């Protein structure tokens, strides 16, 4: 389904003038010549177009003579967006480009008085003023515009679409939006298709988080923590055999069984909500139309009033000899049918450090090759402490090197690989042999092969990310986007879920609540877990100035770790306060066990405007790690010692 470009109004000429201000004989067009859709009534007063009274009458004639009138300026971006909106709805409209009209300046002044609008565009629908760019888009998003257009039903409005909403991507955000929209009685379809990795790995419904991200990562992190707990248990009186071994195959089987149950649960939930699910690859082929191709190559065409892009990201490859042939990514690791053995992890992202951490935690020989800094975008003080802790626990780091070639020495499960790497600041070349090489150098948005250029959706050409409004709307009014593919937004599963639900509520339930992307809590599940909310120290200095922030910090020693006497003065707490705003806490950071559990509650406090004084007045729970935040007294600026002798300070 779709609509022909330039539909006629009342069987007349195309609805949008493309005359560039001239008529057939080359004369500059007068406002009186602009009537392509319907024949305008004769000038009721017989005035010349230069008179204010006549201008008002002429403008009123346009408004009365057409179902949809857009007073526009040809060079105005907002005007173009409004015209695209009506085109996308297949609704005929009349446009008067005032900058291409002989008496346009006078008409614009009169229009300002008549419509009480100070800028263009100005839109009228069925003789009712909708307003400018913002009010028009808002009326569309709330459904008021569509209802008004269908009053007395013009014959040339499009037929109903196949669906109210088609969602491309069956990850956490897309599924949340689908179920929420269906709850309001909307007809919803989800298209989800997993392109296999270079090694052929595929998975089921649920997206990255469920299949190859948060869920298996946390479970394997738990496997590593249990190994540490077994060691600690001897100090608590448990008689554990000295030769405790980890069974990779059993762990993978358990993890994949759990993921399989989640995949099935999602399909059941969609069915119960009456959401149509197709395991097919979605590509836009025209306005409001999409092609769905299944794994057998069978194609179907669907139409929808609105679309939501929730395609997520996939791991990036190095583009060097041997990377796709011999290396794995996180997309492969969590279902790897054999123990990876001696492993090189390439990258310094949270994915790289988390995977390196749990692989080392189950007893493997792990090396991390780092191009520059650890955990780019995170607080670097915390990132460096994580790196130090990992090194102290046997994980090796090769810093300021990048692989330039990966070769297979011996095939097998695992086999043997040779990695050739070059220094980032010299000509030095090094080589190393590993059983497995895992790439975790970043992720790319899945936006370049879904036909966005066909419907005019803008993306950042460098990153593939999609810029959106604060309501997750792309530059094409009927297409929205959420999740990791958004430009300059937090890439976290709960954020995508929240954005998806709120979007559906705005579109179909009359809500005006938008997703708040500020002060989003997160946790990095490295061996020493890192929880954070708000600004990093670097960002706080950049935003408020070093002289206007105060950093309170302290090491702490979890009581549970005192009996095995390990990792004293490794756990660390830090808050960053804005001294110009009553020492409001603008950054919260913690390294230690259960960091995510600790951070979650404090995130709510930060959203409520938590101050240092309020923290100080809070009585802590003893003995727990989180109580350290109620007793922070040493500032970084002071340089005083923050070492702890025991769990009670």
Curated annotation (Swiss-Prot):
GO terms assigned for molecular function: FAD binding; identical protein binding; NADPH peroxidase activity; thioredoxin-disulfide reductase (NADPH) activity
Residues binding FAD, per UniProt: 172-173, 192-193, 208-209, 213-217, 281-282, 311, 350, 484, 491-493, 622
Keyword tags: Acetylation, Cytoplasm, Disulfide bond, Electron transport, FAD, Flavoprotein, NADP, Nucleus, Oxidoreductase, Phosphoprotein, Redox-active center, Selenocysteine, Transport, Ubl conjugation
PTM comment, free text: ISGylated.
Limits of the Glutaredoxin domain: 56-156
Modified sites of kind N6-succinyllysine: 218
The keyword Hydrolase belongs to this UniProt entry's keyword annotation: no
Covalent cross-link Cysteinyl-selenocysteine (Cys-Sec), where: 647-648
Keyword Transmembrane helix: no
GO terms under cellular component: cytoplasm; cytosol; extracellular exosome; fibrillar center; mitochondrion; nucleoplasm
Modified residues (Phosphotyrosine): 281
Co-factor note (free text): Binds 1 FAD per subunit.
Binding site for NADP(+): 316, 348-354, 371-372, 376-378, 442-443, 465, 491
Biased composition (Basic and acidic residues): 22-36
Cystines in this chain: 209-214
Entry EC number(s): 1.8.1.9, 1.11.1.2
One of the GO biological process terms: cell population proliferation
Oligomer status and interactors: Homodimer. Interacts with HERC5.
Note: The thioredoxin reductase active site is a redox-active disulfide bond. The selenocysteine residue is also essential for catalytic activity.
Family of the protein in this entry: Belongs to the class-I pyridine nucleotide-disulfide oxidoreductase family.
Name of the protein described by the UniProt record: Thioredoxin reductase 1, cytoplasmic
């Amino acid at each position: 389904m779709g609509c022909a470009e330039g539909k006629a109004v009342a069987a007349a000429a195309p609805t949008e003038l493309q005359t560039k201000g001239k008529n057939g004989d080359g004369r500059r067009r007068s406002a009186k010549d602009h009537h392509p859709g319907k024949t305008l009534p004769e000038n009721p007063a017989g005035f010349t177009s230069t008179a204010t009274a006549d201008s008002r009458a002429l403008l009123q004639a346009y408004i009365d003579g057409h179902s949809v009138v857009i007073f526009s300026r040809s060079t105005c971006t907002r005007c173009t967006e409004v015209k695209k909106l009506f085109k996308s709805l297949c609704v005929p409209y009349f446009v008067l480009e005032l900058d291409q009209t002989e008496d346009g300046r006078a008409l614009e002044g009169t229009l300002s008085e008549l419509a009480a609008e100070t800028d263009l565009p100005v839109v009228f629908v069925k003789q009712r003023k909708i307003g400018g760019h913002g009010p028009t888009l808002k009326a569309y998003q709330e459904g008021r515009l569509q209802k008004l257009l269908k009053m007395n039903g013009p014959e040339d409005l499009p037929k109903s679409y196949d669906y109210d909403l088609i969602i491309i991507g069956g990850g956490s955000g897309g599924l949340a939006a689908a179920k929420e929209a269906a709850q309001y009685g909307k007809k919803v379809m989800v298209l989800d298709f997993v392109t296999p990795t270079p090694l052929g790995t595929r998975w089921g419904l649920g997206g990255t988080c469920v299949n190859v991200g948060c869920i298996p990562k946390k479970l394997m992190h738990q496997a590593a923590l249990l190994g540490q707990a077994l060691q600690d248990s001897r100090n608590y009186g448990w008689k554990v055999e000295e030769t405790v071994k980890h069974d990779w195959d059993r762990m993978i089987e358990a993890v994949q069984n759990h993921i399989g149950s989640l995949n099935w649960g999602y399909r059941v939930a969609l069915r119960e909500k009456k959401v149509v699910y197709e395991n097919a690859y979605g590509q836009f082929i025209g306005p409001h139309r999409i092609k769905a191709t299944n794994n057998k190559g069978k194609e179907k065409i669907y139409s929808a009033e609105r679309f939501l892009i929730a395609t997520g990201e996939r791991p990036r490859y190095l583009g060097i000899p041997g990377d796709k042939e011999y290396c794995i990514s996180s997309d492969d690791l969590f279902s790897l049918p054999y123990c990876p053995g001696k492993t090189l992890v390439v990258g310094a992202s949270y994915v790289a450090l988390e995977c390196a951490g749990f692989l080392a935690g189950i007893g493997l020989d792990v090396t991390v090759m780092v191009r520059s800094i650890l955990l780019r975008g995170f607080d670097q003080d915390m990132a460096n402490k994580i790196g130090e802790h990992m090194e102290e626990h046997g994980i090796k780091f090769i810093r300021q090197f990048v692989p330039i070639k990966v070769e297979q020495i011996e095939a097998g499960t695992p086999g043997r690989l040779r990695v050739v790497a070059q220094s980032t600041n010299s000509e030095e070349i090094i080589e190393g042999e590993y059983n497995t090489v895992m790439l975790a150098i970043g992720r790319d948005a899945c936006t370049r092969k879904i036909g966005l250029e066909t419907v005019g959706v803008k993306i950042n050409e460098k990153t593939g990310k999609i810029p959106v409004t604060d309501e997750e709307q792309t530059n094409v009014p009927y297409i929205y986007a959420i999740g990791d593919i958004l430009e300059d937004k937090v890439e976290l599963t709960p954020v995508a879920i929240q954005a998806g639900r709120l979007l559906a509520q705005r579109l179909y339930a009359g809500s005006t609540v938008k997703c708040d992307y500020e002060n989003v809590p997160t946790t990095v599940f490295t061996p020493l877990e890192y929880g954070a909310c708000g600004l990093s120290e670097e960002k706080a200095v950049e935003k408020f100035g070093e002289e206007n922030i105060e950093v309170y910090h302290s090491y702490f020693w979890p009581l549970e770790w005192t009996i095995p006497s390990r990792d004293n003065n490794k756990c660390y707490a830090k808050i960053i306060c804005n001294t110009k705003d009553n020492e409001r806490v603008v950054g919260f950071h913690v390294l230690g066990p259960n960091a995510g559990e600790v951070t979650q509650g404090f995130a709510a406090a930060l959203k409520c405007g938590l101050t240092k004084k309020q923290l100080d007045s809070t009585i802590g729970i003893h003995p727990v790690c989180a109580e350290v935040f109620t007793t922070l007294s040493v500032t970084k600026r002071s340089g005083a010692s923050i070492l702890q002798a025991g769990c009670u300070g």
